[in-house]
C-alpha cells in the first residue's frame, strides 16, 4: 500500500494556496497520464470528485479550516487508486491563531465561490460540470447536509466540549440555517 499527499502529487511546496477546481482537474490529469492508469489501475474519477467536495463540506461544517495539501492524500494498492481516509481533522477555526483555508473555491473566471463563511454550492457544482453532472453532485451534497442538521446534538452526546460547540467562528448552532442558505437543505 502506498500513500501520497496532494502537495506531493502536484509537486507543490507546503503552504501553497490551491483552488479546488484546478486541483481536482490537475490530480485527475496527473493520475490519468500516469503509467499506473495506462497499465490498468482503476481510478473512479466521478467518485473522487464527489468525495472531494463532500469532504470539503465536512471541513466547513466541523470548522476544520486546515485543509492544505498535506491533509489530503491518495492510497494505491496493486490495482486501484483512491482518496485515503480523512486524517488530521479538527475544528481549527477555534485555534487562537486563526487558521485560514488553504484550498478555496473559485470558478474558471477566478470569481470566488466562498466568501466570509458563505459558500455557493450550486455554483461549485456547476464549476465542475466538465467532470460530473452538477445535479448528481448536488444530490450527494444534499444527502450529506441532511446528516449534518443535528450535528451539535451528536457532538454533545459524544462529549465535545462546550467551548468548541459554542465557538462563534465555527457556529455549530447555525449550521442548519447555513446549509439552507448554501442551497443544500
Language model: regions and residue ranges:
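Anionic ligand-binding catalytic core segments
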Residues: 1-69, 73-185
Amino acid at each position: 500500500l502506498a500513500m501520497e499527499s496532494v502537495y506531493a502529487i502536484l509537486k507543490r511546496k507546503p503552504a501553497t494556496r490551491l483552488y479546488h477546481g484546478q486541483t481536482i482537474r490537475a490530480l485527475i490529469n496527473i493520475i490519468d497520464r500516469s503509467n499506473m492508469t495506462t497499465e490498468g489501475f482503476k481510478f473512479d474519477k466521478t467518485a473522487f470528485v464527489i468525495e472531494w467536495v463532500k469532504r470539503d463540506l465536512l471541513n466547513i461544517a466541523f470548522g476544520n479550516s486546515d485543509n492544505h495539501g498535506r491533509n489530503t492524500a491518495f492510497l494505491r494498492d496493486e490495482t486501484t487508486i483512491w482518496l485515503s481516509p480523512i486524517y488530521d481533522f479538527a475544528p481549527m477555526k477555534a485555534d487562537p491563531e486563526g487558521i485560514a483555508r488553504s484550498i478555496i473555491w473559485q470558478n474558471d473566471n477566478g470569481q470566488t465561490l466562498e466568501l466570509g463563511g458563505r459558500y455557493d454550492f450550486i455554483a461549485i457544482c456547476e464549476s465542475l460540470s466538465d467532470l460530473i453532472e452538477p445535479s448528481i453532485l448536488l444530490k450527494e451534497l444534499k444527502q450529506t447536509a441532511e446528516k449534518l442538521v443535528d450535528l451539535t446534538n451528536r457532538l454533545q452526546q459524544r462529549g465535545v466540549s462546550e467551548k468548541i460547540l459554542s465557538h462563534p467562528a465555527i457556529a455549530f448552532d447555525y449550521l442548519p440555517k447555513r446549509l439552507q442558505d448554501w442551497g443544500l437543505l
